Amino acid sequence: MKFFIDTANIDDIRAANSLGILAGVTTNPSLVAKEGVSFHDRLREITKEVSGSVSAEVISEDAEGMIEEGKELAAIAPNITVKVPMTLEGLKAVKVFSELNIKTNVTLIFNANQALLAARAGATYVSPFLGRLDDIGQDGMTLISAIAEIFDRHSVSTEIIAASIRHPLHVTDAALNGAHIATIPYKVLEQLVKHPLTDQGIQKFLDDWNSQK
């Protein structure tokens, strides 16, 4: 499973990229709004830092508007992936983007039927939201597993991005259940690195070393 970072904060992106594990970035209008910068300017910054997929979301609600926006976004850099909501209009836009060889990430996926529809429309990625399903008492991992099985059984090449990740267990379970990618906030990435026994082990090594001086 690959790692994307879910942020529009350029410092977090640079920090994650320095670790050698970053395969891409996902953004959304809420994340960009927090940064207080021009959307297009920030995308230019991100695409210079990261060579992998950078998802940038359209805000239009009709297919025509999505297509117009998506073309503008795709023109910013060759590694831009246009992020499209899972709606009927979104599917129409995905079909056109697929014909134009513009990569797409269909977001706000909450059931397997939505994922399969998006894939058949030509989506490069689908993004099921784990945390938001947890919030309403549903099991996001069952959804990841179902999508992965359907895609495998029907030879679907669309990749599954586990999104709305809240904690390290989401990452582990997403990998076990067949997600191709986990897109994670930087704070969760930091948590993945940590374990108390690792810290204790490092301290013991240091103490033992220093005791010999």
UniProtKB/Swiss-Prot annotation:
Any one biological process term the GO annotation gives: carbohydrate metabolic process
Catalytically driven reaction(s): D-sedoheptulose 7-phosphate + D-glyceraldehyde 3-phosphate = D-erythrose 4-phosphate + beta-D-fructose 6-phosphate
One Pfam family recorded for the sequence: TAL_FSA
Keywords: Cytoplasm, Pentose shunt, Schiff base, Transferase
GO MF annotation: an example: transaldolase activity
CDD domains: Transaldolase_FSA
Enzyme class per UniProt: transferase
E.C. number(s) listed in UniProt: 2.2.1.2
Catalytic center residues: 83 (schiff-base intermediate with substrate)
Subcellular localization: Cytoplasm
Highest taxon listed in the record's lineage: Bacteria
Pathway connected to this protein: Carbohydrate degradation; pentose phosphate pathway; D-glyceraldehyde 3-phosphate and beta-D-fructose 6-phosphate from D-ribose 5-phosphate and D-xylulose 5-phosphate (non-oxidative stage): step 2/3
Annotated GO CC locations: cytoplasm
Record-annotated disulphide pairs: none
PANTHER family listed in its UniProt record: TRANSALDOLASE
Cited function: Transaldolase is important for the balance of metabolites in the pentose-phosphate pathway.
Family according to the record: Belongs to the transaldolase family. Type 3B subfamily.
Alphabetical list of HAMAP family matching this protein: Transaldolase_3b
Protein name: Probable transaldolase
